[in-house]
Amino acid sequence: VSNDGRLLPQMFEGGMITSNEIDNLTLTAGQIERATSRASSNSTGLSVAGGSEASNKFYFAGGDWKVNSDLTAQYYYANLEDYYKQHFAGLGHNLALGEGSLKTDLRYFHTTSDGKNGKEAGYSVGGYTRNGDGKIDNNTWSAAFTYSLGSHAVMLGHQRVSEDSNFVQLNQGGLVNESAGGASVYLLTDRLVNSFTRAGER
């Protein structure tokens, strides 16, 4: 989630633990409590785009399972208290094809409201929501196929965002007088001119 789009990188305060005790399985869990933006030296609580109230509890846990040398499966769960709960599933596969290789990258996010989101002032997500109440309810999926040959690669991809609300991630831009905006996210479109994360975009 850290964004490095400015001179100074975004930083987070919290803790994380990673385990590789089981063969071919990497487990990760942690908690984030505060963030320091790209344009400030002070830390703030956590929020989403449009949210003006801060949360200090972001939990995450999940794992990467290397099924074989060419196939990796991922699952992660995250919860920003009073804003959202998010499930992520991913699948990556490499296939030797002629003199090159074909990489398949599938990603799916299911995000729903948590706690005060959509119920109390300051805990609403920005942008369109189906009932106009700022409630988070989103499914986003993407598929990308990349053929690589030597030092060259060409990618064909598709991403689709459901119509009930925007895709969400940690973004403190709505916190009053903090200038703490900016976020990166695990989507194929993150480094494009537009991230295409608004409700209904594809």
Residue positions per predicted region:
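Outer-membrane beta-barrel channel domains
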Residues: 1-34
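Solvent-exposed loop/turn segments connecting transmembrane beta-strands
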Residues: 2-9, 35, 53-55, 78-88, ...
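Hydrophobic, lipid-facing positions within transmembrane beta-strands of outer-membrane proteins
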Residues: 13-15, 25, 57-61, 71, ...
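Short, structured patches in soluble enzyme cores that scaffold and shape functional sites
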Residues: 19, 31-33, 65-67, 75-79, ...
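Short, flexible helix-coil linker/hinge segments at the edges of structured domains or between repeats
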Residues: 28-58, 111-113, 117-121
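Outer membrane beta-barrel transmembrane domains
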Residues: 40-49, 55-65, 73, 91-92, ...
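Outer-membrane beta-barrel pore domains
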Residues: 79, 83, 89-202
